UniProtKB/Swiss-Prot annotation:
Domain of life: Bacteria
Organism: Sulfurihydrogenibium sp. (strain YO3AOP1)
Transmembrane parts of this sequence: none
Protein name as it appears in the record: Methylenetetrahydrofolate--tRNA-(uracil-5-)-methyltransferase TrmFO
Gene behind the chain: trmFO
Catalysed reaction, written as an equation: uridine(54) in tRNA + (6R)-5,10-methylene-5,6,7,8-tetrahydrofolate + NADH + H(+) = 5-methyluridine(54) in tRNA + (6S)-5,6,7,8-tetrahydrofolate + NAD(+); uridine(54) in tRNA + (6R)-5,10-methylene-5,6,7,8-tetrahydrofolate + NADPH + H(+) = 5-methyluridine(54) in tRNA + (6S)-5,6,7,8-tetrahydrofolate + NADP(+)
InterPro entries: FAD/NAD-bd_sf (IPR036188), MnmG-rel (IPR002218), MnmG-rel_CS (IPR020595), MnmG_N (IPR040131), TrmFO (IPR004417)
Amino acid sequence: MKVAVIGAGLAGSEAAYKIAQAGYKVDLYEMRPEKQTPAHKTPYFAEIVCSNSFGSESLTSGAGLLKKEMEVLGSIILDVAKEFKVPAGQAFAVDREKFSKKLTEILENHPNINVIRQEVKTLPDADIIVIATGPLTSEEFSKEIQKITGSEYLYFYDAIAPVVDASTVDFSKGFWADRYGKGTGDYFNCVLSEQEYEIFYQELLKGEQVPLKDFERAVYFEGCLPIEEIARRGKETLLYGPMKPVGLIDPKTGKRPYAVVQLRKENIEGTLLSLVGFQTKLKYPEQKRIFSLIPALKDAEFVKLGSIHRNTFIQSQKLLKPTLQLRKKPNILFAGQITGVEGYMASAATGIIAGINVARMLEGKEPVVPPKTTMIGGLINYITTAKNELQPMGPNYALLPELEEKIKGKEERKLKKAEIALKDIKEWTKEIESAVFI
């Protein structure tokens, strides 16, 4: 059977290597350097285009746990990265050029990997295909993905609102309700008085913003204004927009609040809550500072901060099985940021799972899904079951199930979840008995 992996980024590199290591031939397509993206500069695979950090190594961070799980599964990205690690405190940082160059050499010289340097415009002739073309997928291949998935399921921009850990919200500073009493009370309304709104509004206007890159300039014309841009249109504009209190009565006062910030469940379990309509270009420290002025969020832990930037990704919850296979065409798998995961390690992790599942399909075995108790499993569960429109997500502990036993202390709870995750990923690896682990 013929196998093709499209895109030699972090996810595509992991997938191709897993398939090749299992003893199967794979065509790995990469359009660079024949055709560059606006962000890439080199011809190397898995080029690190933003920060050179792969995130914290601490087990109390989602990124730290994810890397430990990837080590258990065998990650070529991490193996190479360790050779070119640079001092960065608790973070895992790499010499980006040496890392990408070495990885490229390994994949190009692998006897089972046939590297094809050309832009893919239509699906190649192959029995099994992994699409891992990333956030800057070419225009031509984006059209092909639209044909495969349906145009309404392919997004070209992130307009991401911040997401908080529900367990850190002060629920005494608001109430659950839908507007006009409709629905089942799915929104938590963070209440602000006139004075609190005034302070919030003034700080929002002062907040430092991230400048848009040239290739992101068109985003504002997509009808998705950042909250700070709405605020600049006038002091009361937010009160008729994302902070409008109409149709809501505070049960404590029996009156309509002056302003509200609505929180909506991001996952089925309700452990993640997003700030509705709060997409923003504010710098990260500014977001934490300003959004913490909302009384209910004074001590909230932000597991994801807002952004607006160019990012091609599919609505995986409508399209993918938890095995990363396309529901309607299970011989096509997706991996990496195009699935709606965010960050280097999350992208690489989905590539590992896609590679494992392709190898299993070639072995005549059923594709598999990692346990939801693991960070990899939690991420895949999130992107394939998101309640509303999928907004990209990176590794964080709110993706994992709540503990059955009560443990005091946030760090202690995270460490217990990490212990369970590592035990479960090791057991799962033994259970699936695939050639990829030989």
